Amino acid sequence: MWTNLVNGCHAALSSVVSSPTYTTPRNITIIGGRGRMGRFFTQQLTAAGHNVSILENEDWEYADHLLGSAELVIVSVPIKWTVDVIKRASQYLAPTTALCDITSVKTEPVQAMLEYHPGPVMGLHPMFGPNVKSFAQEKVVACPGRQDDSFEWLLDFIKSQGGEIIVSTPEEHDYMMVIIQATRHFSRFSVGVFLAQEGIDIERSLSMSSPSYRQEIDIIKRLFAQSPHLCVDIMLATQDRCQAIAKLADTYNRLASLVARKDRTALIQEFENAQSFFSEENISSPKLSQENHADRHLSRYRMPVVPNRS
């Protein structure tokens, strides 16, 4: 509850102190702009004074106008259609048009944009769902492709609204998303399916639960409040994700077999191995590595450090 309250205060404050400063209005077309994430970007960019047009599947007869005159085109369609849409849209774009996608997979889309469009290219991945009200306190991963300066105004806008830009290569992004998204979704998906299968009285369980259990149930509820197509597509998006989920399932089975055998010694050893991995020393090092990595790639896109006022 307190986390939601604090985040809500941050978002409200951001909307006051980060009112869009004057910017040159740009012509933007969002392919898939009536989808949930497409609507979010449409609302944010329109509120900032830009001219936003939408191209849906039934609008391709107008593509020459909607795409040919655009300064920025954002591809916001399901993962399985992204590359095909990039290929189709690119034939209408001017060489100076900036092209980006906002799907949760980056290697293939960025490669496709570089192959089919000679102009500015960047992959973006908003690390939040479409239910948020603003970019405040949210992260967006940016994967540079070509002519990065053409996207500087967009990234600066996201930062001005309280967002944080994390710079990554497409390959690093996809590697990290195997864990951040795919296996995490599968783990919570599995627990949700198990609870439904067992017919657990969730309300009764919450009445006698710990704070961590209530938090986990809230996270699972939010997962199942999403589109089932989106959740499944995230898990199945790449072969690497499917293989990682299979390995996670193998780990579950191996640990479950130890429980079935009541092998206390082996379970304690597994716990201690993981405990060592999650030690303070191991967890702090990647953060420093990430900061150094970002310094080497487009450091101008990083947010300034804001003193902790709590």
Stretches found by the model and what they are:
Residues 2-65:
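NAD(P)+-binding Rossmann beta1-loop-alpha1 motif at the extreme N-terminus of oxidoreductases
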Residues 93-108:
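ADP-ribose/adenylate-binding Rossmann-like module
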Residues 106-109, 113-177:
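Rossmann-fold dinucleotide-binding core
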Residues 76-78, 103, 144:
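Glycine-rich, N-terminal phosphate-binding loop of Rossmann-like dinucleotide-binding domains
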Residues 24-27, 96, 137:
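Phosphate-coordination loops involved in phosphoryl transfer and adenosine-cofactor binding
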Residues 64-92:
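Rossmann-like NAD(P)-binding element
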Residues 169-309:
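An accessory alpha-helical subdomain
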Residues 30-31, 75, 142:
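Hydrophobic Val/Ile/Leu positions in short beta-strands of Rossmann-like dinucleotide-binding domains
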